[in-house]
Regions:
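Glycoside hydrolase catalytic-domain context in secreted enzymes
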Residues: 1-758
Length: 758
């Protein structure tokens, strides 16, 4: 038989090119070899010298999956069901990285002879002992180090068992650093885009599709094959902490963006395609959070025990499903559906009318098996959100377990309930023992045949996401290609242009904008009180200039004297408050306080006297009402600074730039300023390019901006477009799809298609 393949050994990797067939790559250190058949080469992944179907790249993926799934032991399948806790690949000692640091031969990185791309002791243990093959990576030192670490992972597991590769995943990592500089033609560490709300503010599904395509290529160059995104929760509750990670509250827009995002990430083209749109540049999209997490009562978030209930006072549950069922599950790129789904932590209160069960979505047989799988025909991977099988010890801890509604069950029983609900995978769990205990519970209740079939059904789903992106043939990364791909100048350019398109001009009194370059600008410092981040880490009080002076100087002369300034810029953030107060608890209260979207202290005069949902083993009450209670924003000084700056500037132009994480009450300062720009996580340079007239604003509001907190209290958590909107002194209503360009209110095809009158 004529040989139809060639071989190259370089940098410890064997690369085999089959004529008109797959390119294979494996490590010289892993101990595997090749099998020859019909003149072609195949990886002998389990080192038995036999060309079994799962090794044969010529066969349909379904046959390969069936073969391998039936060979796996229950323990190996249980390992596939694990999705690791957060892994940091960095030498940084900041608080975030330190939380996820490992050891090297028992030593900290700086005390060992290891380099940052080596595997930690903990990683080696869960890869071998627990058969874990799905890893969530957070911060990485550099693209090249990420690629090397990925290769080290793949080489390590290649010589184990059946040679199943690792599926590395990531939460969104394309956010822009405000003070970084964009240089046309220059590359970067990764392309920089606006956050999800900013992508939504473009009202351009094709831009989002382009983002997915670019970000997917960058992910694969980093070794990442699964994206824990998009977050397509319909953001109908304006106070929600995760509002900025969504595409807003318009179901038609969110649905189209969901489709575009997933198609962009998942679709491979031409030579990169393996089959049906899937291939070597594809990234599995894990769409979240089923069945929609945007209706938490009073805006509280289910990462915390104080926010575990989603409510539906408007009876609008089904509309929250549409971004999934009409978007992520109806893709145009050939891959058909998002490869994975993540249910949210929330208890979707009183939505299970059949079983009358109020448990976290990942535990709900009705929401996962009956609704998602049976009614909507979804047979992809379902993965829990992180840590739902662990106990919670505090009401306000981000890192505590999220065992909502099943607190009385043992850890093994929780795993078992998740599996019976139709879920395949456990986010944030590194240990196989509880899954094996769940297997034994199933065997005792239903018999070995039933529970084994249940495990193999999940194995097939999980293996599909490895096969369809080509990891069995070539899981390795070329570091030189990584350097060329990640942060490529073309990608950086498109990301920067998307940032510019995402900026919304809300107010332009007397056409004060644009402001010609080389004028003199005054930018006051921001003042923030002490606070805590998501993880409970203390952030000290501070005063700081909100922009990099050198960046501003490229456009305008910067002065600290308002008298010398031609105009002023006030950089603000939307008000920051929490719906739970340890101080209130310490004073004998329940801890529940209102989340405020205004800068001045707020007292709830219209809040519910009885909450719609409540109850927790750590609480002796079930009424989570905050009626009559008060709260204040840690950044109230943002408003003070606007008032002070107006006094200092007299009648000279004052522009407010609001970094908006949530819809913000603007009536407190709108009449004091001449212009308002809304920023969704963009570089300062993008803002300056618009302020100076280099580009024209085109962003549109993907949500409503309320006139006052009373409107927020009256709206229903699950219903969109039910607030009275702010109307400015020019009589413009800050409603969904509103925005200005230099000539006035935008009325283009986007508004016609997605606006409230469409």
């Amino acid at each position: 038989m004529q040989k139809k393949w060639s071989q190259l050994i370089e940098n410890g990797l064997v690369t085999i090119k089959n004529e008109n067939g797959a390119t294979l790559r494996f490590s010289t250190e892993s101990g595997i070899g090749i099998i020859e058949a019909d003149g072609y080469a195949f990886k002998d992944l389990n080192r038995n010298g036999k060309l079994q179907p799962y090794k044969d790249w010529r066969l349909p993926i379904s046959e390969r999956i069936e073969d391998l799934a039936n060979q796996l032991t229950i323990s190996e399948i249980a390992g596939l069901m694990l999705y690791s806790g957060h892994q940091a690949v960095t030498s940084s000692k900041n608080s975030f990285a330190s939380m996820f640091a490992g050891t090297y031969d028992g030593l900290a990185l700086e005390d060992s002879t290891a380099v940052v791309s080596d595997l930690t002791d903990q990683q080696k243990e869960f890869l071998t002992k627990d058969h874990l093959r799905h890893i969530l990576v957070t911060v990485v030192e550099s693209p090249e180090i990420s690629a090397t670490w990925s290769n080290n992972l793949q080489a390590f597991v290649e010589g184990l068992g059946h040679g199943i590769p690792v599926n590395i995943s990531s939460d969104p990592r394309h956010g822009a650093d405000a003070n970084s500089e964009y240089n046309a033609g220059a590359g970067g560490d990764i392309s920089k885009w606006p956050e999800a709300l900013g992508l939504a503010a473009t009202f351009e599904p094709e831009l989002v599709r382009d983002f997915g395509h670019i970000a997917g290529r960058e992910y694969r160059a980093l070794g990442i094959a699964t994206a824990h995104s998009p977050q397509v929760d319909l953001a109908t509750e304006p106070r929600w902490m995760r509002f900025s990670g969504t595409f807003g509250e318009g179901v038609k827009l969110v649905t189209d963006l969901s489709e575009a995002y997933c198609s962009g990430f998942q679709t491979s083209e031409k030579a990169s395609e393996i089959h049906s749109g899937w291939g070597y540049t594809s990234v599995n999209a894990m769409v979240k959070h089923w069945p929609g997490g945007g209706s938490g009562e009073a805006g509280r978030d289910a990462h915390y025990a104080f926010g575990k209930y989603a409510v539906y006072p408007g009876g609008n549950f089904k509309e929250h499903l549409k971004p999934f069922t009409e978007g992520a599950f109806k893709l145009k790129g050939g891959t058909e559906k998002a490869a994975a789904v993540m249910p949210y932590y929330t208890i979707s209160t009183n939505q299970d009318l059949k079983n009358r069960e109020n448990v976290g979505n990942g535990y709900s047989h009705y929401l996962v098996q009956e609704l998602l799988r049976d009614e909507y025909g979804y047979d992809g991977v379902v993965c829990t959100d992180w840590g739902i099988t662990k106990d919670h010890q505090e009401m306000d801890s981000f890192l505590s377990g999220k065992d909502w509604g099943v607190e009385e069950l043992t850890v093994a029983e929780r795993h078992y309930k998740v599996l019976l609900a139709g879920v395949d995978q456990f986010g944030g769990n590194n240990e196989v023992e509880p899954i094996m205990a769940a297997y034994e519970l199933g065997k005792a209740e239903f018999g070995k045949e039933f529970i084994e079939a249940r495990f193999r059904r999940s194995a097939k789903r999980l293996l599909r996401n490895l096969f369809q992106v080509g990891l069995f043939e070539n899981p390795y990364i070329d570091s030189a290609k990584t350097k060329k791909t990640v942060g490529h100048p073309d990608f950086m350019k498109k990301g920067f242009e998307a940032q510019q398109k995402s900026i919304i001009l809300l107010k332009n009194q007397n056409n004060v904008l644009p402001v010609a370059k080389k004028q003199t600008v005054y930018i006051p410092k921001r003042r923030l009180k002490a606070s805590k981040d998501w993880f409970g880490q203390e952030i000290p009080a501070r005063e700081f200039l909100p922009v990099e002076a050198a960046l501003v100087e490229k456009y305008y002369h910067l002065t600290t004297d308002p008298a010398q300034a031609d105009f002023a810029l006030c950089f603000m953030e939307s008000p920051q408050t929490s719906g739970f107060s340890i101080e209130d608890l310490a004073k004998g209260g329940t801890g529940y306080v209102p989340i405020s979207l205004q800068y001045r202290p707020y007292t709830a005069r219209l809040g519910r006297k009885e909450s719609l949902a409540g109850g927790d083993p750590l609480e002796a009450f079930s009424n989570r009402s905050y009626y009559g209670k008060s709260n204040e924003a840690i950044n109230e000084a943002d408003l003070d600074i606007v008032i002070e700056t107006r006094e200092k500037m007299g009648n000279k132009p004052l522009i407010a730039i609001v970094a908006m994480k949530n819809p913000t009450i603007l009536h407190e300062f709108e009449t004091l300023v001449d212009g308002i720009l809304v920023d969704f996580g963009v570089q300062t340079q993008a803002l300056l390019s618009l302020l100076s007239g280099e580009v024209e604003p085109s962003g549109l509001l993907p949500f409503q901006i309320p006139d006052k907190m009373e409107s927020v209290e009256k709206q229903l958590e699950d219903v969109p477009f039910d607030m009275t909107c702010h109307r400015d002194e020019n009589h413009n209503s800050y409603d969904f799809a509103y925005g200005l360009n230099w000539t006035g209110v935008i009325t283009d095809q986007r508004v016609e298609k997605y606006g409230l009158k469409s």
